[in-house]
A protein has these predicted regions:
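Short secondary-structure boundary/capping segments
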Residues: 44, 174-179, 324-331
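Conserved DEDDh/DEDDy metal-dependent 3′-5′ exonuclease domain
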Residues: 80-82, 95-101, 105, 109-116, ...
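Short acidic-glycine loop/turn motifs at beta-strand connectors
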Residues: 117-122, 236, 341-345
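Flexible loop/turn segments at secondary-structure boundaries
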Residues: 133-134, 168-169, 264, 316-320, ...
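Terminal, non-catalytic protein-protein interaction segments that mediate quaternary/complex assembly
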Residues: 245-265, 269-280, 347-378, 385-388
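Metal-dependent nuclease catalytic cores that hydrolyze phosphodiester bonds in DNA/RNA
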Residues: 3-120, 250-290
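Cys/His-rich finger/ribbon microdomains and the adjacent scaffold used
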Residues: 17, 23-24, 28-29, 53-55, ...
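Conserved RNase H-like, two-metal-ion catalytic cores of nucleic-acid enzymes
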Residues: 65, 103, 296-375
Length: 388
């Protein structure tokens, strides 16, 4: 599922300079300038927007989903021509289930996560996602694959999105048929075919441009994925600007931008932000000292009693449940750090817990935490909602 994406991230686009892949196509649906910049100005890409944990989860989920329909043959990732040739060989052998089946025609390329081969000309297409719901961009992803296979003469009997069922609870061996939900999207994909054709035609012309296209900032800079070229495309804005206001909604930032309210000087005279956001603006403009709400701090300090404990957790969220009685993406706490002071002015002491790799940490952590924190003591945490 993620092998082609990995190729783009790790090796660049050179391997597909003469192809529109499904990854490229989906990027173009978001904003065609992404592809133009990747090809012509790749050094401007901010790789910090790439969430490696999400990519790793996607790879693990994709690998697991390959077994949904029993035995399968996976097309090894490598040279694209070799992948296409291997797929044809497997299709000729009537291999029932092919993972990463790869197809190319007329400068278009796609790998299908799971392809069920019904006969010489009929197939079913399954696109695997590690999310817990079906997002709009997934329809475009499947629609591009449908378009490529149809151009090659295959009859796509059904298009499906396979995604995580967040209601699944693991008990014993992992049940992948309960872990995954399959949503048929054939009708939606067929309805998008004219749009796919128009997008491909537009993209081919767009990529011929020698001069940098003049596309403005908009929702596409943030959705469906944050764009790694946003810093470059917003370089003409003053620093600081509306997009650097902490806590403001993206819709609010874009509303201000479209009204020409961009600099902090502009923002200081508008009424579209919150009180806390104006404090940030005033601090920057007038060099105010850090804002300290002494009254609220005083009220909080009145609630403090001793012994006093300071608790912090660390957790992870596996897409695939690792332990019994856990769900996909459930927070699994594996570490805590506990500082405490027994009396006012006393020495700051420390206790901690760190789980052993490979073990379910939940019970041992809970038992030690109960032993480390007495009942009815004052316990503080930076993120009370999470630590509770």
């Amino acid at each position: 599922m993620t092998s082609i994406l990995k190729c783009i991230l790790i090796h660049g686009d050179n391997a597909m300079d003469y192809h529109i892949s499904k990854s490229r196509y989906c990027s173009a649906v978001q904003c065609p300038k992404i592809l133009w910049l990747k090809k012509n100005m790749p050094e401007e890409f901010d790789s910090s927007v790439v969430n490696q944990a999400v990519l790793d989860a996607g790879s693990a989920v994709g690998d697991l989903a390959m077994g949904l329909f029993g035995d399968f043959v996976e097309v090894p990732f490598g040279n694209l021509s070799d992948m296409v040739a291997k797929t044809k060989q497997l299709m000729d052998l009537q291999t029932p289930v092919i993972a990463e089946a790869s197809f190319s025609t007329d400068g278009l390329f796609c790998s299908v996560d799971i392809l069920k081969v019904l006969n010489d000309t009929e197939v079913e297409l399954y696109e695997v996602k590690s999310s817990t719901s079906v997002h709009d961009i997934y329809y475009h992803d499947a629609a591009f694959q449908y378009y490529v296979l149809s151009k090659l003469g295959y009859k796509v009997r059904s298009c499906n999105i396979v995604h995580i069922n967040n209601q699944y609870e693991r008990n014993g061996e992992l049940d992948i048929h309960e872990l995954f939900t399959i949503k048929e999207v054939t009708a939606d994909v067929i309805a998008l075919q004219h749009e796919v054709e128009a997008n491909i035609r537009m993209l081919r012309e767009y990529m011929k441009q020698i001069e940098e296209p003049e596309d403005d900032i908009g929702e596409h800079c943030f959705s469906p994925y944050p764009c790694g070229f946003f810093a470059y495309c917003s370089r003409h804005l003053p620093t600081p600007n509306i997009f650097q206001v902490a806590g403001a909604r993206t819709t609010t930032k874009l509303k201000c931008y479209r009204k020409g309210i961009v600099s902090f000087e502009d923002l200081n005279t508008c009424d579209l932000l919150s009180g806390a956001q104006y404090k940030q603006i005033e601090h920057e403009l007038f060099h105010y000292p850090p804002y300290i709400d002494k009254e609220r701090i005083g009220e909080f300090m009145q609630t403090i009693t001793y012994p006093l404990y300071f608790l912090d957790f660390e957790s992870f969220q596996p897409a695939i449940p690792l332990y019994d009685h856990s769900h996909p993406y459930e927070q699994i706490v594996f570490q805590y750090s506990l500082h405490y002071i027994e009396s006012e002015g006393g020495e700051l002491k420390h206790k901690e817990f760190l789980a052993y790799p490979g073990e379910d940490p939940r019970r041992k952590l809970a038992e030690q935490l109960c032993a480390d924190i007495p009942l009815d003591v004052c316990t503080t945490a930076y993120n009370m909602g999470f630590e509770k």
